[in-house]
Amino acid sequence: MQVFYGLLLMFILCSTIHLSEQWCSTCLDLACGASRECYDPCFKAFGRAHGKCMNNKCRCYT
C-alpha cells in the first residue's frame, strides 16, 4: 500500500511540473504596459491575436 501512495505522489509531482512548463509555452519575452500591445506579437508568433499583458510580459492564448 505504501508503494501505491509513493507512486501516486510521484505522478502528481510530475504532472504539476509538466503543466507548469506548458503554461509558459505561450509567454513571450516582450515587455508590455497594456494588453493591446500584445495583439500583434501574439498574432505573429501563434497566428491568433488573443493576448494579455500579465506581470509586464505578454501572454498569448492559443
Swiss-Prot record:
Superkingdom field: Eukaryota
Pfam families to which the protein is assigned, alphabetical: Toxin_2
SUPFAM superfamilies: Scorpion toxin-like
Cellular compartments per GO CC: extracellular region
Family annotation (PROSITE patterns): SCORP_SHORT_TOXIN (PS01138)
Site (Basic residue of the functional dyad): 52
Keyword Secreted: yes
Site entry (Aromatic residue of the functional dyad), positions: 61
Signal peptide boundaries: 1-22
Subcellular location: Secreted
Disulfide-linked positions: 24-27, 32-53, 38-58, 42-60
Tissue expression as described in the entry: Expressed by the venom gland.
Keyword terms, alphabetized: Calcium-activated potassium channel impairing toxin, Disulfide bond, Ion channel impairing toxin, Neurotoxin, Potassium channel impairing toxin, Secreted, Signal, Toxin
GO molecular function, one term: toxin activity
Keyword Disulfide bond attributed: yes
Family affiliation: Belongs to the short scorpion toxin superfamily. Potassium channel inhibitor family. Alpha-KTx 12 subfamily.
Additional note from the record: The N-terminal C2-C5 disulfide bridge unique to this toxin does not appear to confer stability to the protein. Negative results: inhibits with a low efficiency Kv1.1/KCNA1, Kv1.5/KCNA5, Kv1.6/KCNA6, Kv4.3/KCND3, Kv7.1/KCNQ1, Kv7.2/KCNQ2, Kv7.4/KCNQ4, and ERG/KCNH2, and does not inhibit Kv1.4/KCNA4, Kv2.1/KCNB1, and Kv3.1/KCNC1.
Functional summary from the UniProt entry: Potently blocks Kv1.3/KCNA3, Kv1.2/KCNA2, and Shaker potassium channels and inhibits high conductance calcium-activated potassium channels. Is potent against Kv1.3/KCNN3 (IC(50)=0.55 nM) and Kv1.2/KCNN2 (IC(50)=6.19 nM). It also stimulates the release of NO, IL-6 and TNF-alpha in J774.1 cells and presents a pro-inflammatory activity in mice.
Name of the protein: Potassium channel toxin alpha-KTx 12.1
Higher taxonomy: Eukaryota, Metazoa, Ecdysozoa, Arthropoda, Chelicerata
